[in-house]
């Protein structure tokens, strides 16, 4: 077959494989044992049967720093599925790597899961743990309004969100506590005097920074 025909056949084979995959409704069983009042996610969430066969890690609410407010749980400001992300992130952040760095958490949820609100939920939990400085990195400067909305949606309207470029690169941001919003492109930029935005951000965070990044 020609290259075009080969690609068409490959695409058809892939479609047939996808049709054969079995999907199951996802339920955060481990979380519900610790937070029985958690609400269902507003949209239907599924996972393929292979993933469903793998047991999720135990939720350790007692060991990890979990300070999620009752209002967030009982009013469904975060669904059970989103709360699960906040809890697993907190558990992961409790670990320290061999080089002394705090362990990170990767969120691979697909479209419609409310990832922005999940990130806001992680900040909400850390804020209530006493960590008052956080950095939100995004692809677009316009998404700062989404970050503000997401924090408001998890009952944190008083957390101030400011853009890093509200200040000149040579100046340390005067935001004492809150979320500093920065885009990837701004993060690698310099001003006309050669001052780097990354250095500016590092100065704001300080050596004792323990917030979300």
Where do the protein language model's features map onto the residues?
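The Walker A (P-loop) glycine that initiates the GxxxxGKT/S ATP-binding motif of P-loop NTPases
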Residues: 109
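Motif I (Walker A/P-loop) of helicase-class P-loop NTPases
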Residues: 114-124
């Amino acid at each position: 077959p020609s290259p075009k025909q080969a690609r068409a056949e490959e695409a058809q084979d892939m479609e047939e494989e996808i049709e054969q995959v079995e999907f199951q409704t996802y339920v955060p069983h481990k979380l519900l044992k610790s937070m029985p009042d958690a609400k269902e996610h507003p949209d239907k969430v599924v996972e393929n049967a292979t993933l469903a066969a793998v047991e999720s890690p135990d939720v350790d609410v007692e060991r990890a720093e979990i300070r999620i407010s009752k209002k967030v749980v009982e009013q469904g400001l975060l669904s059970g599925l989103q709360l699960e992300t906040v809890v697993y992130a907190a558990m992961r952040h409790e670990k320290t790597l061999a080089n002394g760095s705090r362990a990170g958490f990767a969120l691979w949820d697909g479209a419609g899961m409310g990832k922005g609100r999940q990130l806001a939920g992680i900040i909400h939990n850390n804020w209530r743990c006493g960590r008052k400085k956080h950095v939100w990195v995004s692809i677009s400067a316009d998404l700062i309004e989404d970050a503000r909305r997401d924090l408001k949606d998890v009952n944190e309207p008083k957390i101030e969100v400011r853009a890093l470029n509200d200040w000149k690169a040579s100046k340390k941001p005067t935001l004492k506590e809150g979320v500093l919003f920065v885009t990837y492109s701004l993060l690698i930029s310099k001003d006309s005097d050669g001052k780097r935005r990354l250095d500016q951000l590092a100065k704001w965070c300080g050596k004792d920074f323990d917030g979300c990044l």
